[in-house]
Amino acid sequence: MKILTVDIGTGTQDIFLYDSNLDIENGFKLVLPSPTMMVYRRLKQAFPSRTPVLLYGHQMGGGPSAWAIEEYARAGIPVYMTPDAARTINDELEKVEALGITIVGEDEVESLKSKVERLELKDFDFPLVAKTFADYGVSLKDLAAVAVAVFDHGNAPPGVSDRQFRFDYLDERIRARNSLSTFAFLSSDIPPIMTRLQAVADSARDLPCPLVVMDTAPAAVLGAMFDSKLSVYHSNNLHDTHPSSLPTRKAMIVCNVGNFHTLAFRLGEKGIEGVFEHHTGEIDLPKLEGLIRKLADASLKHEDVFDDMGHGALMYTDEVFEFGKDEFDVVVTGPRRSMFALTPTPSPYGRGGSLRPYFAAPFGDMMIAGCFGLLAATAEILPDLAEPVFGSLRSGRGRGVAPWDA
């Protein structure tokens, strides 16, 4: 039984093909440029020719792609975008047009074909992934499921901050079901306000199997907890993904330092006790440690992050999480995790001392942590897949079979 998992970030897209016949460590994996970086590089390469560009397809992750598109417009190079593609820049299309970008209907795409360089926008390109695996002799024609993670701010109403809108959504989901997997959905159950998740589903309508989509933030945290030292899933109930199944640590703080966003979840016996999200480019180690300490002592306020150009914070407890009881203070993952390896500097928060990180590497690979979170969430949403998936994910339960004997 195979499940394809794709964790799409700002810098990279991380791909893991789960095969129930193989130990997790022998599963095939890829770390490739993210879709937004692919668009960014293509536009940068084409920029000197000043050729008009038409961007069509779906809403996708912004950041680098949006920066490159806006650079074209500022340079006076004609830029045309279909409405769905334009939402990559902003959900309010009049703001896209204010940048000097021309919005065109889908029926106009063909007539512009000979006059522009065309570029299709989408986060998830299953045919390309399938071709890549096929070139190495691996077929994706027998998948039981596909799971894709993207970071979605949601479609905020005009005049509403997309950062605030996202945190209102996080709060709503956590209060509805306090579990990291509450942020995963079958493609048919995606909340209407989560337009980037829906765009992933729209671009994958021809899949021959169920599609699960999830937010990247909880996927990374959920996956990190499969590190054998954390022992999260050593439970008699294979389907139990609730933090109360923790036998060795009843609470922990997990921080994911991504290329574009940094977040931390405080997890306890009853689930998520607090969370904050910031932009990685706006923080350094002292600031990050200060926020984590506030998350731990339950003094963290939404404004502490939001007013500093971050997304925000949520607290669901007033109990103090005490550091120093274990051999590490915070679990760290993410491609920019080296921030915690830098020489400590005095904290501006006046609390003294540096936090002791544990660099989680589930099944020996930190970069695939989000894929393992996707895998676990998929098994929860599709119960028929749960037993083999959780049987594989439980640390120390490998079959010890060589790939040629599987």
Regions found by a protein language model. Name each.
Residues 13-17, 262-266:
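Short beta-strand scaffold segments in enzyme catalytic cores
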Residues 19-21, 267-271:
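Short acidic-glycine loop/turn motifs at beta-strand connectors
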Residues 272-277:
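C-terminal catalytic subdomain
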Residues 260-261, 281-289:
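Redox- and metal-dependent alpha/beta enzyme cores, enriched for Fe-S-associated oxidoreductases
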Residues 290-300:
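A charged amphipathic helix-loop-strand protein-protein interaction module that recurs
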Residues 1-4, 10, 18-240, 247-252, ...:
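Nucleotide/phosphate-binding catalytic cleft detector across ATP-hydrolyzing
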Residues 206, 249-250, 257-261, 268:
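Short gly/pro-enriched beta-turn/loop segments at secondary-structure junctions
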